[in-house]
């Protein structure tokens, strides 16, 4: 099924892109062939249909080799083939995915090399369906075609990004057929289709059999055939926020903006969440609202299956609350008086202490404040200057 493509060594990740199937196509898999120990019988005669539909083929002259790019694969020498008693290419909507490596310099004019050849159309001279290297004309050399009888042919090299697939290198081709509608072909990339056109002349389907590798010189790693058009979505490869740290006052709002990459991502929707909505709420558009003092993380997550996320830390403050500190006054009798006060009161105490040391001000300082040891009681506390040994100030960060 389509999720097996990665395990087959097929990589449709273009630079800055990542792709996932638009849906689960496993139920549309008609036939699947892999030229390795899982897909070939121990006697090297039967090519198994791993889809479970029983479209097995009989191999003749096919060599199984280890290739540096393809791994375990089949080599066809021009006379080898795999023969089937069935038509493995279905009628109607279809996708055929082939991973191959074609030897260079093996073609000559007037020669066909078939990756797949499926029977002759009713009395027609050309096969009803074929995927072939076609060198009928000099301009066709080194090209791979997707053909239906005498209709228009879909060739890989018609796109400037594909110069030559007969270059002794690994390639993956995707041929889509939309049941007499627009047909798209891809090669090694899903960023842009290689070519697109409407087939003419209809679609032939006869009782003739199918052959893999007829007259072909080169390697085949795998073939997958579907009775639906396999399409892909571009999913995000990265995301960012316009800010990663923010500070708000209670009641204040701000807008976080998420940027999803690349620009052509199919689904750019995101999900916003707050680690504590009672402190900072966030709506579906990234608007945040500060509700009470505290710190939270606001997270944005892509909704296309890539599950990429970014976080902004938001601190909420209340400007009506002054800076706080703990004033520790050590008395000559060893007692330590602690006062949880604002910095304005600390500064007033320090000013009084300095002036009293110079001989002015009252001989005592009055605190009308809540004491740390008894936070629920308002105290009127008097500190006598001559009884003070020392004092310290501890700032509170929150």
From Swiss-Prot:
InterPro entries: Big_2, ConA-like_dom_sf, Invasin/intimin_cell_adhesion. Pfam families: Big_2. Residues 240-306 form the BIG2 domain. SUPFAM superfamilies: Concanavalin A-like lectins/glucanases, Invasin/intimin cell-adhesion fragments. Coiled coil: none annotated. This is Uncharacterized protein CA_C0552. It comes from Clostridium acetobutylicum (strain ATCC 824 / DSM 792 / JCM 1419 / IAM 19013 / LMG 5710 / NBRC 13948 / NRRL B-527 / VKM B-1787 / 2291 / W).
């Amino acid at each position: 099924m389509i999720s097996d493509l990665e395990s087959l060594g097929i990589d449709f990740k273009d630079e800055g892109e990542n792709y996932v199937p638009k849906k689960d196509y496993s139920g549309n898999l008609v036939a699947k062939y892999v030229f390795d120990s899982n897909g070939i019988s121990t006697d090297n005669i039967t090519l198994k249909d791993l889809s479970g539909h029983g479209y097995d083929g009989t191999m003749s002259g096919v060599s199984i080799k280890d290739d540096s790019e393809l791994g375990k694969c089949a080599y066809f020498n021009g006379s080898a083939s795999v023969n089937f008693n069935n038509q493995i290419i279905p009628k109607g909507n279809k996708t055929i995915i082939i991973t191959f490596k074609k030897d260079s310099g093996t073609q000559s004019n007037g020669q066909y090399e078939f990756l797949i050849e499926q029977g002759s159309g009713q009395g027609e001279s050309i096969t009803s369906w074929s995927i072939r290297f076609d060198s009928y004309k000099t301009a066709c050399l080194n090209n791979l075609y997707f053909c239906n009888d005498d209709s228009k042919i879909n060739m890989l090299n018609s796109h400037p990004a594909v110069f030559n697939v007969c270059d002794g290198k690994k390639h993956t081709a995707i041929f889509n057929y939309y049941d007499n509608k627009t047909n798209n072909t891809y090669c090694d990339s899903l960023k842009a289709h290689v070519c697109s056109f409407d087939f003419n002349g209809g679609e032939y389907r006869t009782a003739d059999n199918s052959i893999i590798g007829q007259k072909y010189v080169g390697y085949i790693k795998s073939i997958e055939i579907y009775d639906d058009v396999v399409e892909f979505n571009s999913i995000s490869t990265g995301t960012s926020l316009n800010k990663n740290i923010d500070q708000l006052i209670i009641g204040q709002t701000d807008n976080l903006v998420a940027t999803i990459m690349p620009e052509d991502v199919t689904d750019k929707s995101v999900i916003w969440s707050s680690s504590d909505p009672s402190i900072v709420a966030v709506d579906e558009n990234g608007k945040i609202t500060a509700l009470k003092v505290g710190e939270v993380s606001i997270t944005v997550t892509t909704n296309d299956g890539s599950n990429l996320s970014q976080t902004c830390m938001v601190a909420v403050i209340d400007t009506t609350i002054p800076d706080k500190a703990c004033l520790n006054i050590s008395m000559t009798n060893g007692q330590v008086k602690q006062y949880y006060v604002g910095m304005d009161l600390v500064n007033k105490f320090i000013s009084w202490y300095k002036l009293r040391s110079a001989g002015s001000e009252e001989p005592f300082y009055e605190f009308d404040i809540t004491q740390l040891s008894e936070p629920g009681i308002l105290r009127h506390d008097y500190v006598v200057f001559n009884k003070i040994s020392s004092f310290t100030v501890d700032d509170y960060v929150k």
